[in-house]
């Protein structure tokens, strides 16, 4: 990633749902932000969420109220970065650099 490195075992989750008008833009931002890195992201449908992942969210006191929601997983510790908002590429890259 230009200008910094990411923490090992970092992953992003983009929580979406059908008819979400901002979800395609959020996925495009994430794709661009992690381009040229070893990071990946996983899209998760809010209404068909894996129960284990849902439990992880609850353990980390993360409640998804709107989509798109972007969750950072740093070695198992989940953090809600954005909910109902499409961040900029620069905002995502800054978070991933830890700034």
What are the functions of these language-model segments?
Residues 71-99:
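Non-catalytic, surface beta->alpha helical segment in thiol-disulfide oxidoreductase systems
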Residues 30, 39-40, 71-74:
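Non-catalytic interaction surface on structured domains
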Residues 55-61, 93-96:
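Short amphipathic alpha-helix with an adjacent loop that forms part of the alpha/beta core around
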Residues 2, 24, 47, 60, ...:
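Chalcogenol-based redox active-site neighborhoods
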Residues 39-54:
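Thiol-based oxidoreductase modules, predominantly thioredoxin-like and allied folds used
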Residues 60-71:
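Structural micro-motif
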Residues 2-37:
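Local sequence-structure signature of Cys/Sec-based thiol-disulfide redox active-site neighborhoods
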């Amino acid at each position: 990633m230009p200008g910094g490195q990411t923490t090992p075992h970092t992953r992003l989750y983009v929580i979406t749902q059908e008819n979400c008008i901002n979800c395609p833009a959020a996925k495009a931002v994430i794709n661009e932000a992690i381009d040229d890195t070893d990071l990946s992201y996983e899209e998760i449908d809010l209404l068909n969420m894996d129960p284990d992942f849902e439990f992880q969210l609850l353990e980390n006191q993360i409640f998804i109220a709107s989509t798109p929601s972007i969750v950072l997983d740093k070695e198992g510790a989940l953090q809600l970065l954005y909910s109902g908002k499409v961040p900029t590429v620069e905002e995502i890259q800054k978070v991933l650099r830890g700034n």
